[in-house]
Amino acid sequence: MPCWCLHGAAFLPSILVIWSSAGFLFSYIISVLIGHVPPFVPYISDTGTSPPESGVFGFMISLSAMLGAATMYTRYKILEKQNHSTDFLPYYFNKTSLAIGLLGCIGMGIVATFQEMAVPAVHDAGALITFICGVLYILLQSYISYKSCPAWNTRVTCHIRMAISVIAFIAVVPMSVFSVLSGRKRLDWKPSDEGYHYHLTSAICEWIVAFGFNMYFLTFIRDFQGVSIQISTEIHEDF
């Protein structure tokens, strides 16, 4: 009997959450043990700036971006099929949500590729795209969940998704503002440093948003359990 989180296409959000969480935690543990960052509380990107943890961070976050794109596209196709049956949503709404989500995944790839201290402007742009598009995506998905309730979602699931979305939305604002107010980029933050409290608040909010995304994708598992993914292959003899 397969694990409940592997039924149907549920393996996609399950692997996404496990892999992403492991990517954050592994790079954090390595960077703290080596002494590259203080244990409380670095930015997520700070834990993937210096080698060897930068290699772990880049590899795992790049794969997370691809898993995220695959999960979002599957979610898009599920909603498309459901909408054909009950017509609860304008077609463009689903496409807009997918486009925003995929843009966030591209931002994630930029974060993984361009390290914080090496190319800060590009890295920061990628991070901003990731978090803003990610929050917009889960807000749109929460709205869609309410529109599809009770035919395709329970009211409890809708409330959980909206609660996570609101928390992420609230956290992403101070994350961005206090990041600017904290001043210059550095890895070795100390409580006596100017701007430390801004940095601390921003970093805590960043972790809240990041794991908020993971918690949100966990709620997709139930929806994906009744779905199968098929690959169709055709050979054109005149090619």
Curated annotation (Swiss-Prot):
Transmembrane segments: 15-35, 54-74, 98-118, 119-139, 162-182, 201-221
Cellular component GO terms held in the UniProt record: lysosomal membrane
Role description: Lysosomal modulator of autophagy that plays a central role in p53/TP53-mediated apoptosis.
Gene that this sequence comes from: dram1
Descriptive protein name: DNA damage-regulated autophagy modulator protein 1
Family annotation (Pfam families): Frag1
Family of the protein in this entry: Belongs to the DRAM/TMEM150 family.
Keywords: Apoptosis, Autophagy, Lysosome, Membrane, Transmembrane, Transmembrane helix
InterPro entries: DRAM/TMEM150_Autophagy_Mod, Frag1/DRAM/Sfk1
Organism: Xenopus tropicalis (Western clawed frog)
Compartments in which it is found: Lysosome membrane
Domain of life: Eukaryota
Gene Ontology annotations of biological process type: apoptotic process; autophagy
Membrane topology: Multi-pass membrane protein
